[in-house]
């Protein structure tokens, strides 16, 4: 309603000071304007925004051809929208980002333009934009709460003023309000005059008259109706009071402003509506949303302090199943992409000895002069050597004589094949322990002295301590698995189980650290097969976005494990699983058609962090130096993944984080802001939208892969001391902000 807020375009100066009841925000459309308060003058040029807060004294002076527009919110309207509105004080500072200034101006330009056009849907659009403007101010404009502003030196007088401004239309008396604040009438009257320079009744009548002016200007209601709805007992009483304050009768005041309609009131002076709309169009940009769906506000103040903490990056181990899969050019491309994006340099392949034993025991004999039984293996080794990948091979059921003989033939051939080239980093991985491993590892180490032995740990490991002790000199790493889904019955809604599941990976890690320390077998750990909560089906695994949960686990593990394992892609992973539950034991980086899953981008963003930790808390870590640092913020909510499938119990929530980085060196900084959440980088959202009963064609595949990336925003900002960031965090989302100061010129 027009009485809730005013939308104005001004082309003439305002000669006298007024005290504002409510909140005003505007900007200079053209030319130059001087905005005055009690103590200062602010010069505003085209595009500059100004804010006038509740009870501020203000006036403006427009220079030649100057035009300003503003939206003035009445205090009663603001009080209906949020608590303590009368205490809210907005202030634009150097820390208010250019992006947020643009967005505020964009909303206001749209709002004023819509107001001027006055078409069929103007009212509805106008109200949407008004709410958007308020929401944007609340979320992105720095503010404080002034419970006692400078013009009032007494809290109780402040309370009385607030009460009058919200209840001016009611029958108010000094007696009633003195009882409201617990003072005598004489004491309240004295304090009121001391604080405001006018008496109680004068302030009450001024407030009522200002609201009555709005009704006279913007409504066709009768004088009597206007009098009664603004707190006057009769039309005669209203007319007397109105003339005392304005030197006009209500009828004369309305007559001086004939037929001012809402679309006409903005086109003052020499400007027509079309000219104003053209000027406003220069400030209008595309907007993604009308309404911000923020459910929670969070404030972080960060100042960097010296710390001895270090963040360790992981050695990533990629499982490819059978070694021959390395001959697939698509898989090769995926490995090279991982190597480029987050330094993947180790491949884990299944045991090749059954394949070699089959060839060695074939019913015909291979002629070494015209054939090579290791031909395809050599091609795989060449790919690894060409791109500096190390090879880790899983040895399985190796306790037979035939197996050991085949193993020696294979190892001897590999040693010969790589002898003329740079060394291949070669590791062996065993999940079961047999005495035959002693003979095999001795032979292996003779040919590959830098080769490693990986031993899998589980609850049965302690039964093999004597053998472990004998192998200890050769052991490089211990390997273990941890799957959070094992801790939960997904058919139940037991919060305790989900709380336990959230700690499953770190608790299992600590268990094995304690185990190897107790037996003096200290070696680095590799977490090979692992997963966070996903549910126990393919559907929940895709629909339940968990980027923040994964990054939370990586941060907790970075000081405890050296290596992290992934499957390369969905097809390889699922082809080596017995059932859906088995599939949930591990995570893959790629889906089909080279689509990158969010875990891929999680690893990529984690890899952008540097080792020196400047700050950390439960949902944030900052690494780097004070002039070149990375801010990682994340949300990690562990809940039943099946709730992600229920539209009636949608667990998506949005939090606005106001982050201030203080005490930065003055200068120009470059900001790169990556956002990974269910709206930015979640592959399955787009996949399902573009998948038909016949699958996906090339255009759909290319589009989905092109769009399934984290959002990236890049901009420069001039910082004097504080970097202020406003971050919209969706459930289990991740934000990485890279901040780098440009060298001084």
UniProtKB/Swiss-Prot annotation:
HTH araC/xylS-type domain segment(s): 158-256
Keyword Transcription regulation appears in the UniProt entry: yes
Annotated DNA-binding residue span(s): 175-196, 223-246
Keywords, ordered alphabetically: DNA-binding, Repeat, Transcription, Transcription regulation
GO molecular function: DNA-binding transcription factor activity; sequence-specific DNA binding
InterPro entries: Glycoside_hydrolase_SF, Homeodomain-like_sf, HTH-like, HTH_AraC, Tscrpt_reg_AraC-type_HTH
NCBIfam families per UniProt: TF_Staph_AryK (NF047455)
Protein name (database record): Uncharacterized HTH-type transcriptional regulator SAS0078
Organism classification: Bacteria, Bacillati, Bacillota, Bacilli, Bacillales
